Amino acid sequence: MEQVVVIIGSTSDAQKVEPAIQILQEFNVEVGVYCISAHRAPDGLKHFVKKINDSGHTLVIIAAAGKSAALPGVIASGTIVPVIGLPLGGTPLSGKEALYSMTEMPPGVPVATVGIDAAKNAGLLAIRIIATQVSDLALGLERYYENLAKKSLEVNEQIHMQYAENRSSDHFQKV
């Protein structure tokens, strides 16, 4: 089994989890992607979660689902491996029903949940969890966030300069 297992409930969800897979691969985290529906194949999902438990290798599970979004909760009920719920949009309620389903879990069945369609954040949260045990990964995350801050400050400077130049033009002068 891989360090991070991404489980989707439908093939239509595959493209939506790509940002999570990409960031995990960028950090050289072993990732596997599986499609097992909590509604259509509950016994198959139970068997797969048991396989994850028996392997002892998987450190985080990302479960992506839309609509009623039972997938993360069903997975979390069968494992002590941290489960990150990734609510997916593209539904009549724009993913809110999936978000509510994942955040309103009963006591004893925790699911960490990221924002609707926030696959990259799901991947980054998985990396953060693993980085508590893997120092090389922690160092990589530090560099990642330093670079993110640097880019943000560069954008700030560009925006500031753009509007500073415009302030001196007639466009911003009082009438």
Language-model-detected regions and their locations in the chain:
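Short, glycine-/small-residue-rich phosphate/pyrophosphate-handling segment
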Residues: 93-139
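Glycine-rich phosphate/diphosphate-binding loop of Rossmann-like nucleotide-binding domains
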Residues: 1-40
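Glycine/charged-rich beta-loop-alpha catalytic/anionic-binding loops adjacent to active sites
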Residues: 2, 28-31, 54-58, 81, ...
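N-terminal beta-loop-helix "entrance" segment that forms/cooperates
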Residues: 33-54
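Glycine-rich phosphate-binding loop
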Residues: 48-87
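Short glycine/serine/threonine-rich phosphate/pyrophosphate-binding segments
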Residues: 13-18, 42-45, 65-74, 93-96, ...
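Glycine-rich phosphate/pyrophosphate-binding loop and the adjoining helix
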Residues: 130-175
